[in-house]
């Protein structure tokens, strides 16, 4: 649904950010979804600023395979034990390249316009998507989902700027 909203709203200059929140049906699943903020300092102002700029990641210990986007199989981390997710240290753009740096990550799926455009294993905690190697004419955004056996961390959309935004 989020990708559908993005493809409908971005042409009008409206970015829809994704959030994660626990929808626990048992006490063992409390706090199974949460947010990571890329904070310079811990303050209400810094959190708000990150939210306004999309400098945060959603995280979940439960991921249902849809057959289109997401893992090949459902992910359900065990209840009541430490379940470390991928630790994103940076997501940067330089020219037409997007680079993800993350620890404790197995692979990343790059998604654009609701479709997986690339899947990469992280090499030394790093993966780079080179947009020059892809057909980007209709691409509105790129986002990524970072997986390990305990769940998934997802980025906010990186809007493709062609200099004609409303």
Regions found by a protein language model. Give the residues of each.
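Substrate-binding surface in catalytic domains of secreted glycosidases
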Residues: 1-10
